[in-house]
From Swiss-Prot:
It catalyses: tRNA(Phe) + L-phenylalanine + ATP = L-phenylalanyl-tRNA(Phe) + AMP + diphosphate + H(+). Keywords: Aminoacyl-tRNA synthetase, ATP-binding, Cytoplasm, Ligase, Magnesium, Metal-binding, Nucleotide-binding, Protein biosynthesis. One of its GO terms (molecular function) is tRNA binding. This is Phenylalanine--tRNA ligase alpha subunit. It comes from Cupriavidus taiwanensis (strain DSM 17343 / BCRC 17206 / CCUG 44338 / CIP 107171 / LMG 19424 / R1) (Ralstonia taiwanensis (strain LMG 19424)). PROSITE patterns: AA_TRNA_LIGASE_II. InterPro entries: aa-tRNA-synth_II, aa-tRNA-synth_II/BPL/LPL, Phe-tRNA-synth_IIc_asu, Phe-tRNA_ligase_II_N, Phe_tRNA_ligase_alpha1_bac, Phenylalanyl-tRNA_Synthase, tRNA-bd_arm.
Length: 343
C-alpha cells in the first residue's frame, strides 16, 4: 500500500507538471481526486481492512491526498502566473517612446481682437470697464438721450426680458456697451466728489444683443466702446486716438481714415469713421462723436465744464477686416477647421 501511495504522488506531480493549460490540469485532477480517481478508490477499500490497519492506512491516504492537492494548487498558480506574464508582455509599454501630444486649445479670433484692443488702449491710459448684460430701459436708452419713440426701443430691434428691476424699470439685453460708460462715469464722479477729478478715459468691451441675423449681422455680437471726458477734450483728440488705434491694430502706418457726418442720439456732432481699402473703397468701421450734453448730465457731469468724445466698434467687424473673413457666422459655428487657422 505504501509503495502504491508513493507512486500515486509521483504520478500526480508528473501529470500536473505536464499540464500546459487549466483544462488539461482539471482532467488530471479528476484522475487522482475525482469520484473514480485513484485516491478515492483507495479510500473506498478501507472498509475491507481491520480497524487497526484501517486507521493507519486512512491517515496515510489523507496525507498523500494533501500532497496531491498541494501539487495541484502549485501548478494552478504557475499557470496563472504564466498567463499574467504573457499578458503583461503583450501589453508592455515602452517608456522610452515619446508620449502623446497634449491637445491644446487657443483663443477664439474675436477674443484675440478683444485682448489686442484692450492692450492698445491700455497703453495710452484707458481703463477697461465691465457691466451687466441685462440692463434697464433707462440705462440702455434714456440715459443715452434716446427719445421714447426711437425705433431701437421696439421689440423688433431689442430683446426685452420678463420682469422689472427694483425701481420697476423695464429690463432688456443691452443693445450696446454704452450703458457701461454711463455706469463708469457715474462711479467716477462719485469717487471724486469734492476733489479734483481726473479725466474719464475708459473702454467698454462686451457682448451685446439685437434682433438681427445675416452674413454680416448676428443677434449676439461683441462691441467695444471708448469714452474720454475732460475739460479740454476735442474732436481732434478723437481723430488722433482712433487713427492711432487703427494703425497699431492693423500694424500699418498708411491707414487712411475719414470722418463722415452722421447722427447718433448720444453724441453731437456725430460721425461715422470709414477706413480706406483697395481700389478706392471705403468701409464703415466705427461710429463716434462728441458726447451729447444730456448724456453728460445723466453721468452727473456739468456740460458747461466737461466735454468729451465717444466711439463704438464691433469686435467681429475688426476681426473680419484683420483676417480677411467674409462671413460673420463663421465665428459662431464652432467649426474647428476654421478656428484652427488662428491657433
Amino acid at each position: 500500500m505504501s509503495q502504491d501511495l508513493d507512486q500515486i504522488v509521483a504520478d500526480a506531480q508528473a501529470a500536473f507538471a505536464a499540464a500546459n493549460d487549466n483544462a488539461t490540469l482539471e482532467n488530471e485532477k479528476a484522475r487522482f481526486l475525482g469520484k473514480t480517481g485513484a485516491l478515492t478508490e483507495l479510500l473506498k477499500g478501507l472498509g475491507k481492512l481491520d480497524p487497526e490497519t484501517r486507521k493507519s492506512e486512512g491517515a496515510r491516504i489523507n496525507q498523500v491526498k494533501q500532497q496531491v492537492e498541494a501539487a495541484l494548487q502549485a501548478r494552478r498558480q504557475a499557470l496563472a502566473d504564466a498567463l499574467m506574464n504573457a499578458r503583461l508582455a503583450a501589453e508592455a509599454i515602452d517608456v522610452t517612446l515619446p508620449g502623446r501630444a497634449v491637445a491644446r486649445g487657443s483663443l477664439h479670433p474675436v477674443m484675440r481682437t478683444w485682448e489686442r484692443v484692450e492692450q492698445i488702449f491700455g497703453s495710452i491710459g484707458f481703463d477697461v470697464a465691465d457691466g451687466p448684460e441685462i440692463e434697464t430701459d433707462w440705462m440702455n436708452f434714456t440715459a443715452l438721450n434716446n427719445p421714447d419713440n426711437h425705433p431701437a426701443r421696439s421689440m423688433q430691434d431689442t430683446f426685452y426680458v420678463d420682469g422689472r428691476d427694483s425701481e420697476d424699470k423695464l429690463l432688456l439685453l443691452r443693445t450696446h456697451t454704452s450703458p457701461m460708460q454711463v455706469r463708469y462715469a457715474r462711479m467716477h464722479v462719485e469717487k471724486y466728489a469734492g476733489k479734483a477729478m481726473p479725466p474719464i478715459k475708459v473702454i467698454c468691451p462686451g457682448r451685446t444683443y439685437r434682433v438681427d441675423s445675416d452674413a454680416t449681422h448676428s443677434p449676439m455680437f461683441n462691441q467695444v466702446e471708448g469714452l474720454w471726458i475732460g475739460e479740454d477734450v476735442s474732436f481732434a483728440d478723437l481723430k488722433g486716438v482712433y487713427t492711432d488705434f487703427l494703425r497699431k491694430f492693423f500694424e500699418r502706418d498708411d491707414i487712411q481714415v475719414r470722418f463722415r457726418p452722421s447722427y447718433f442720439p448720444f453724441t453731437e456732432p456725430s460721425a461715422e469713421i470709414d477706413m480706406a481699402f483697395g481700389n478706392g473703397k471705403w468701409l464703415e468701421i466705427s461710429g463716434s462723436g462728441q458726447v451729447h450734453p444730456n448724456v453728460l448730465r445723466n453721468m452727473g457731469l456739468d456740460p458747461e465744464r466737461y466735454i468729451g468724445f465717444a466711439f463704438g466698434s464691433g469686435l467681429e467687424r475688426l476681426t473680419m477686416l484683420r483676417y480677411g473673413i467674409n462671413d460673420l457666422r463663421l465665428f459662431f459655428e464652432g467649426d474647428v477647421r476654421f478656428l484652427r487657422q488662428f491657433a
